[in-house]
């Protein structure tokens, strides 16, 4: 009942608002004319975005391919140790190729110099320090990759040591290498998510 009364009371107010004179449209704003420097900057940004998109596509394609492989059982039809070892060696090669494609694309994205807006000084120094440059980005990426490779090698060497006396050693090392590379791909995808997907 209250709703009906409220609706009936609002009808005249809404009708009056619709029939009230509308303000005259404001004059159109003059179109901004870009300077030659701004036009050049826009062209440089278009090239930058196109290169960035190609590299992001390459990285995400390699990542997606490896994540699909990760969901499948590695070597489901291999039963003998020899067959398992051959299969895992092949699986490691494919994973390594996807890993190299992903990291090469991410590193190339980090190395892309972003065009500077006319009149802007670079690198910008913010409250926490200077902004990253292609040189600092790639140096940090290379250092992290070198540290990770050393860690992965040490981890799989420890697995090798544990299983050295048995015929299973090569399979265990193969699984270790697959696990380490895929875990690292997840880490890198998370670390560079904003670069890859935005």
Q: How would you name each of these model-derived features?
A:
Residues 9-17:
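Hydrophobic h-region of N-terminal signal peptides that target proteins for export
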Residues 18-198:
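N-terminal alpha-helical modules
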